[in-house]
């Protein structure tokens, strides 16, 4: 194994275990980290030989172990053998989180756990009040009043596993250094071995093409924050490098909570951008945007009402302040044409489809 110093960090002899490599976030994060530090020894948990083949084709030196998030004993063992565990898989799987913590806590040396949550955790107020499509002025941040984020109610999405990670970073603070990365709406194409597609905006685009018109939930005034997947991956890279550097300059444990975001957007605006572009590409006939109810949105995709109709606003102060992280990629709006074209391709919908369907071409 060749040792390389990247920005003063020598990563030789560090071993990392990762969960979620073939997913959208994990695929891009691993691509970014492996490009910066090819000398790191990686172990990847994959579900089956098909997934394993895709990882091996792009990363032939990666050690593969086969199992899923229910393979508690395997995850515990692999975590015990790792210096750093990057958890990019299901943010709501309690068993996997417990297994990782158990494995890391059993080590005599200090290790690091970088877990992925999501700002869906901030949706609970609108869900509780059954309010969809209305704007909220409440903006969380990960620096001032961090306890507001780390003490959200237990029924908030992702909160149960967040608590497992936060508790581990407190009870085992001497041996298990934890960080939670909490991304908002993610956009852009991933460069991982399997899934290059995000969810919220692509799903909105898919449904727009299939419905033949744009739509938003309720009044369409809901706010979310957003981040390009490549900018998100840079945050993971900086945390991995901090871990290799003995933890500095990052904070860990109770203060190891990192939002990532570029800016806020309004879902009604995104709906219009998508509809306008879909019409421009000849995929729909009219770019008017209709108002859908909560039930209609949920009928289009799981959690449609929440992810398009509830508010989730956050500021990434900690990563900027401590890690020097800054988003640099294209804006969400700038990526809409490619997203529309990609979703049309996935649906086997050719440009000019709307005119053909109407008998005008």
PLM segments and residue spans:
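N-terminal Rossmann NAD(P)H-binding glycine-rich loop of SDR-like oxidoreductase domains
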Residues: 2-39
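Amphipathic terminal alpha-helices
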Residues: 40, 329-361
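Terminal hydrophobic/aromatic helix or amphipathic segment near a protein terminus
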Residues: 249-250, 257-313
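Non-catalytic, hydrophobic alpha-helical segments
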Residues: 25, 85, 232-236, 260, ...
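Glycine/proline-rich active-site loop of Rossmann-fold NAD(P)-dependent oxidoreductases
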Residues: 174, 188-202, 239-257
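A conserved pocket-lining segment of Rossmann-fold NAD(P)-dependent short-chain dehydrogenase/reductase
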Residues: 203-230, 235-238, 250
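Conserved beta-loop-beta element that borders a ligand/cofactor-binding pocket
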Residues: 162-192, 202
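NAD(P)-cofactor binding segment of oxidoreductase domains
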Residues: 78-149, 158, 164
């Amino acid at each position: 194994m060749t040792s390389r110093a990247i920005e003063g960090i020598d990563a030789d002899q560090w071993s990392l275990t990762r969960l979620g490599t073939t997913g959208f976030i994990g695929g891009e994060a691993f691509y970014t980290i492996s490009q910066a530090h090819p000398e790191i020894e990686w172990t990847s948990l994959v579900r089956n030989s098909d997934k394993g083949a895709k990882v091996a084709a792009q990363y032939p030196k990666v050690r593969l172990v086969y199992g899923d998030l229910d393979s508690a004993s395997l995850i515990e063992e692999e975590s015990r053998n790792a210096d750093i565990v990057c958890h990019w898989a299901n943010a709501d799987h309690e068993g996997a989180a417990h297994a990782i913590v158990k494995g890391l806590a059993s080590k005599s040396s200090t290790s690091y756990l970088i877990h992925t949550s999501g700002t869906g955790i901030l949706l609970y107020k609108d869900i509780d009040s059954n309010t969809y499509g209305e704007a909220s002025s409440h903006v969380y941040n990960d620096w001032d009043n961090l306890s507001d984020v780390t003490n959200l109610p237990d029924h908030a999405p992702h909160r149960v596993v967040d608590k497992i990670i936060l508790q581990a970073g407190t009870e085992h603070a001497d041996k298990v250094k934890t960080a939670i990365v909490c991304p908002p709406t993610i956009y852009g194409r991933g460069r991982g071995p399997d899934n290059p597609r995000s969810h919220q905006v692509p799903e909105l685009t898919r449904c727009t093409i299939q419905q033949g018109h744009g739509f938003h939930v309720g009044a369409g005034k809901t706010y979310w924050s957003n981040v390009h997947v490549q900018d998100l991956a840079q945050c993971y890279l900086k945390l991995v490098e901090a871990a290799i550097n003995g933890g500095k300059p990052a904070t860990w444990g109770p203060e190891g909570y990192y939002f990532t975001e570029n800016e806020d957007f309004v879902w009604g605006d995104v709906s219009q951008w998508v509809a306008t572009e879909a019409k421009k590409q000849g995929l729909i006939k009219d770019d008017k945007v209709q108002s859908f109810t909560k039930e209609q949105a949920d009928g289009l995709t799981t959690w449609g009402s929440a992810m398009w109709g509830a508010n989730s606003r956050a500021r990434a102060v900690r990563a900027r302040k401590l890690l020097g992280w800054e988003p640099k990629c294209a804006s969400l709006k700038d990526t809409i044409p490619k997203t529309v074209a990609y979703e049309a391709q996935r649906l086997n919908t050719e440009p000019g489809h709307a005119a053909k369907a109407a008998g005008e071409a």
